[in-house]
């Protein structure tokens, strides 16, 4: 039995979960509405404010889908109540980020600024540098965990951190494996 899959999901007050045809799960909450088509063979039951996920058999596919299905529903419930966020750090001399309306404008050492329009249900928060050497904080915020992660990865891919000085965009919790520079000639 899947340890994650057998845990029930408690639906908080103010959140409405609808399980439709072919396991189309729709979650409405204070921050918005999320809808996702889950595997039709999984058994999703709602009793009051508790949702449970069961699998029809102990086959390899159903075992794999059990925990996944439960986690996807749980992520939707958390997303419409608290939301999801992914923190990034921008390191490098002259690397900047600013918001123009909802558009994120990044100066990353290219000959032009990079403009990123946010997808629906995604917003950006740009922090302040405390000193010139401190990294600049950038946070991607939204209700869909997968979409927040994809958007953060897309921003990071514009200038991934390099191993010599650590310049670039990295996740806040990410550790960069640093390399030593050239040894140089002895004089």
Curated annotation (Swiss-Prot):
Entry function: This protein binds to the 23S rRNA, and is important in its secondary structure. It is located near the subunit interface in the base of the L7/L12 stalk, and near the tRNA binding site of the peptidyltransferase center.
Name recorded for this polypeptide: Large ribosomal subunit protein uL6
PANTHER family registered for this protein in UniProt: 60S/50S RIBOSOMAL PROTEIN L6/L9, LARGE RIBOSOMAL SUBUNIT PROTEIN UL6M
Disordered: region residues: 151-170
Family stated for the protein in its record: Belongs to the universal ribosomal protein uL6 family.
Organism from which the protein derives: Chloroflexus aurantiacus (strain ATCC 29366 / DSM 635 / J-10-fl)
GO biological process, one term: cytoplasmic translation
Record-linked Pfam families: Ribosomal_L6
GO molecular-function term, one example from the UniProt record: structural constituent of ribosome
